[in-house]
Swiss-Prot record:
Species this protein is from: Mus musculus (Mouse)
One Pfam family hit: V-set
Name of the protein in its database record: Ig kappa chain V-I region S107A
Stretch list, region Framework-1: 1-23
Gene name of this polypeptide: Igkv7-33
GO BP annotations listed: adaptive immune response
Amino acid sequence: DIVMTQSPTFLAVTASKKVTISCTASESLYSSKHKVHYLAWYQKKPEQSPKLLIYGASNRYIGVPDRFTGSGSGTDFTLTISSVQVEDLTHYYCAQFYSYPLTFGAGTKLELKR
């Protein structure tokens, strides 16, 4: 199974500041056949289904604000929130869909810095 290592686990942030979340896969997620990285980022709020933010490592899903950006290649990927809003303070997960079983990072929780 592909292991997804996500960091940090917890992040205290200030509103309007830039945030970066990292994810490392235990093997490359790049398909030379399809020329795509099989890496996605999800946002998960309490009592709600996970929301797809980024697919193919860098493609923003329909309706996702442009403050969310995905980047990276091979095994190393990043989710950047350029200016964190209060509604962004929740859990984020990376996931690989290169091979079965599909596997997820352990998650990153964003909270407001006090």
